[in-house]
Every structure is written in structure tokens, then in C-alpha cells.
């Protein structure tokens, strides 16, 4: 009779351990997949992320915003010409060189507006190069060996009794569900960043039209800072993901499985918070506001 009870006990333990291993395998697999997914998403340029959206934004910019930018250029250049003429002792000390300077500024302003998308896409091409380099380092150094991680836990799981194993099943199931929710939030952050990039690019001709004027040029300068901040945000996101993967990799070796499971949940929450803050951090680095 006692041997039958022991066999039933072992059978139940094997079922629970199998469920725990399944949950842990899913969670660790999600970590590896998340690193690769985020690297792939933040490494895409606006053209590569969605060609149809990019084409729509480009058409809107060229057909709707560029004419407005032309009006802005006209106003800025007229203001610039009046300022240049009147500042020289009420037009008594006019030099022909200043007209050459004015024509040069006009040429630069028109060139910037007509090549706005080339300039903005160059910024994100550079950002893609940086993110791709970071993804190669981070992805290679932080990939978790799921099989090895699970093998290291088997002895500890076999020593546990049914109540503790049942508790672990509940904990791993709960944390696995939380990680799925966090994955949705991370997707929202990544998609939100790309939508912000498209919105930013759609109005780019207007700030570019102001860059040749000393007073109005602050608009264009701040726009460029924000543009670089959006591109550099991808690199900061990769750093956050790399730190997350390293923390999870070290957590696998923890002796207390209960603590390790909730540490994983805490690290995932911290990752989401860090991704939310990455945009503000990038803007503060470039002093964009």
C-alpha cells in the first residue's frame, strides 16, 4: 500500500515538475525572442518598417506641408532681407556682399526643404547602423541557454514536495501571463515610437524652412535635436533590453526558485518602465524639448 502511495506521489510530482519546466521554458524562450524582436523592430528605418505608411507620409509632406514651408521660407527670407538692410545704419552703409549672403541663405533654405526626406532618412539610416551593431553584441552575449537553465533546476525541483511544487506551478503560470501582458506593452511602446517618427517626418519641411534665420532657426535646430533623439532612442532601448537579458540570465542561477520567479516578473516590469523612459532620456541627452 505504501509503495502505491509513493508511486502516486512521484507521478503527481512528475506532472507538476513537467508543468513547471514547460512554464519556465516558455518564459526563458520569451526572453530570447523578446531581445531579437525588439532589436529587429527598433533597427528598422521608416521605409523598412511599413512601406505603405512611409509612402503616405511622404506624399502628405510633399503635397501638403511643402507648400506651407514655401510660405514660411518667403516670410523668413523677407524678414531676413529687411533686417539686413535696416541694421546697416538705416541703409547708409549697404554692402553688395550682404545681398550675396542673402541669396546664399535663400539657396540653402530651398535646398533643405526640397531635400528634407533625404536628410531625415539619413538620420534614421545612421541610427539603424548603430542599433544593428548593438543588437549583434547584445544578442550574442545575452542569449539564454534554456536547456542548460532548466537542467540546473531539476535537482532542486525533485527535492520539493507536492504543495511547494503546486505553488511553483501557480507562480510560474502567473508570471508567464504577466510576461505576455508586458510583451503587449513593449509592442505598444515600439509601435508608438514608430508612429511618432512618422508624425515627426511628416512636418519636417516646416522646421527645415526656418534654419537659415538666426531667430527662427531655433525651431529647426530643436527639430533636428528631436530627430536625432528619436533615432538614438533605439540604441537606448537596446541597452535596456541587454541589461534585462543579463539580469534574467543571472537570475537563472538563483537557489531560491520562488524568489527567482518573482525577480523575473520584477525585471520585466523594470524593462517596460525603462522603455517608457527611453524617449525622455534621449531628448535630455540631445537637449531637445
Predicted stretch roles:
Residues 81-94, 183-187, 214-216:
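Membrane-water interface regions at transmembrane-helix termini and the short interhelical loops
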Residues 75, 120-123, 127, 185-188, ...:
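Membrane-embedded alpha-helices of multi-pass transport/permease systems
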Residues 1-72, 87-97, 107-178, 217, ...:
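Gly/Ser-rich, low-complexity
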Residues 105-106, 210, 232, 250-252:
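Alpha-helix boundary/interfacial micro-motifs
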Residues 183-190, 194-197, 201-240:
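Extended serine/threonine-enriched, polar tracts that run as long, contiguous segments within proteins
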Residues 65, 69-79, 103-107, 111, ...:
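Residue-level signal for the membrane-embedded core of alpha-helical transmembrane segments
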Amino acid at each position: 500500500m505504501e509503495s502505491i502511495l509513493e508511486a502516486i506521489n512521484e507521478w503527481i510530482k512528475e506532472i507538476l515538475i513537467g508543468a513547471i519546466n514547460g512554464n519556465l521554458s516558455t518564459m526563458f524562450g520569451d526572453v530570447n525572442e523578446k531581445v531579437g524582436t525588439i532589436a529587429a523592430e527598433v533597427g528598422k528605418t521608416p521605409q523598412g518598417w511599413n512601406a505603405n505608411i512611409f509612402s503616405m507620409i511622404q506624399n502628405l509632406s510633399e503635397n501638403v506641408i511643402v507648400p506651407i514651408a514655401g510660405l514660411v521660407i518667403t516670410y523668413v527670407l523677407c524678414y531676413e532681407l529687411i533686417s539686413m538692410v535696416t541694421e546697416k545704419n538705416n541703409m547708409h552703409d549697404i554692402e553688395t556682399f550682404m545681398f550675396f549672403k542673402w541669396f546664399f541663405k535663400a539657396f540653402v533654405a530651398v535646398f533643405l526643404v526640397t531635400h528634407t526626406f533625404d536628410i531625415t532618412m539619413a538620420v534614421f539610416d545612421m541610427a539603424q547602423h548603430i542599433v544593428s551593431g548593438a543588437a549583434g553584441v547584445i544578442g550574442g552575449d545575452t542569449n539564454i541557454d534554456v536547456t542548460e537553465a532548466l537542467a540546473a533546476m531539476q535537482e532542486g525541483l525533485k527535492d520539493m514536495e507536492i504543495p511547494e511544487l503546486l505553488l511553483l506551478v501557480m507562480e510560474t503560470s502567473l508570471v508567464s501571463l504577466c510576461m505576455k501582458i508586458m510583451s503587449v506593452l513593449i509592442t505598444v511602446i515600439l509601435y508608438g515610437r514608430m508612429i511618432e517618427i512618422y508624425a515627426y517626418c511628416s512636418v519636417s519641411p516646416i522646421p527645415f524652412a526656418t534654419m537659415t534665420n538666426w531667430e527662427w532657426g531655433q525651431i529647426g535646430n530643436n527639430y533636428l535635436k528631436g530627430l536625432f533623439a528619436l533615432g538614438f532612442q533605439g540604441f537606448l532601448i537596446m541597452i535596456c533590453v541587454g541589461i534585462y537579458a543579463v539580469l534574467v540570465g543571472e537570475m537563472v542561477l538563483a537557489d531560491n526558485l520562488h524568489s527567482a520567479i518573482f525577480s523575473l516578473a520584477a525585471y520585466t516590469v523594470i524593462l517596460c518602465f525603462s522603455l517608457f523612459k527611453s524617449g525622455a532620456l534621449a531628448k535630455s541627452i540631445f537637449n531637445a524639448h
